[in-house]
């Protein structure tokens, strides 16, 4: 189950990036461009998938037996735990700040509609000023997305490859789908 959560969340999280870069670099964030609305909606949906799946993923992590720790020093184990909790923080911060920074009419995804944060009772109850609130959330979303998320994700991938190609342990194998893991074991 942990592997399924891992790959669905990782796929959704990673796919948000080419969409965001296409919107910014190719469409120049032009809201009138024909592809802007479908791409930004897909970016948003993928972010919400990450946010909605990270809760059961965290519950699974907390209430189930963790896999056996890979060989390594105490420092490596501490760094591994910090990196994993950093990934969980990213899986919450990125989609949450993305949602909190949206305004305007509800987004119609055809299967459901999602009310944007400033139109919610919570926003009204908190008595927030959108002109003050939105730029702060937007800066967090874009700064973390551009500078921190890529670093942490690439560090995670590098660590998996390090375990596989340098340490020759099963850390990478046990997180891959069974057929891929078996193929790598045969090599």
Set out the residue ranges of the language-model regions:
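Membrane-embedded alpha-helical bundles that constitute the cytochrome b-like, heme-associated redox core
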Residues: 1-187
């Amino acid at each position: 189950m942990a592997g399924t959560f891992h790959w669905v969340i990782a796929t959704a999280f990673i796919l948000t990036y080419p969409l965001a870069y296409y919107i910014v670099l190719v469409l120049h964030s032009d809201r009138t461009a024909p592809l802007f609305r479908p791409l930004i909606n897909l970016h948003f949906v993928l972010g919400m998938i990450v946010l909605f799946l990270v809760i059961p993923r965290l519950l699974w992590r907390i209430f189930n037996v963790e896999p056996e720790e890979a060989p390594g020093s105490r420092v490596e184990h501490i760094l591994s735990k910090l990196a994993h909790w950093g990934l969980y923080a990213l899986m919450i911060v990125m989609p949450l700040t993305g949602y909190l920074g949206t305004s305007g009419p509800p987004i119609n995804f055809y299967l459901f509609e999602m009310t944007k944060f400033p139109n919610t009772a919570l926003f009204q109850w908190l008595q927030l000023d959108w002109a003050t609130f939105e730029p702060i959330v937007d800066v967090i979303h874009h700064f973390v997305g551009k500078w921190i998320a890529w670093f942490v994700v690439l560090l995670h991938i590098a660590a998996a490859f390090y375990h596989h190609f340098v340490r020759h342990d099963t850390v990478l194998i046990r997180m891959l789908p069974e057929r891929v893991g078996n193929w790598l074991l045969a090599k």
